[in-house]
């Protein structure tokens, strides 16, 4: 996936905030990269009826780039005080702060609404799947393409 204007670290920051808003446990960039890949490309992965950024054959190939974008995004979000790195739970990772949740609550565009719905659908479909299980889903679709 070539990084385009729509796939900047800033856009990844907004998507990461939305994901963290819905999660009640700390997560890392690998998990968010997998969830991001599935959410943006729902139709390609059989989760929903739409691919938010359009349909293409190489959706499964986005995992590494989306994970890298999430890694950059989480660093910036932590520096801005919108996330914290939580080591108090059994699973360490990033959580959203109250300030980060406030930013999410201000996202009111049509795309944001579509993204919220897609993220919820993805979390419902993923259930309690681990990062490894999500990556396996993504790569199995790539192999089948």
Provide a role label for each language-model segment.
Residues 85-109:
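Accessory beta->alpha helical hairpin/"wing" motif in late/C-terminal subdomains of nucleic-acid enzymes
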Residues 70-81:
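Basic amphipathic alpha-helical segments that dock to polyanions
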């Amino acid at each position: 996936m070539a990084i385009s204007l729509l796939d900047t670290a800033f856009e990844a920051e907004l998507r990461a905030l939305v994901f963290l808003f819905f999660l009640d446990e700390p997560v890392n960039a690998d998990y968010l990269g997998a969830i991001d890949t599935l959410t943006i490309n729902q139709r390609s992965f059989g989760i929903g009826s739409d691919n938010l950024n359009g349909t293409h054959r190489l959706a499964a190939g986005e995992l590494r780039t989306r994970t890298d974008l999430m890694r950059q995004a989480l660093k910036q979000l932590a520096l801005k005080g919108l996330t914290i790195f939580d080591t108090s739970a059994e699973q360490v990772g990033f959580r959203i702060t109250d300030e980060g949740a406030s930013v999410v609550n201000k996202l009111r565009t049509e795309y944001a609404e579509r993204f919220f719905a897609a993220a919820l659908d993805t979390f419902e479909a993923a259930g309690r799947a681990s990062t490894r299980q999500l990556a396996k889903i993504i790569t199995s679709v790539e192999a089948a393409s």
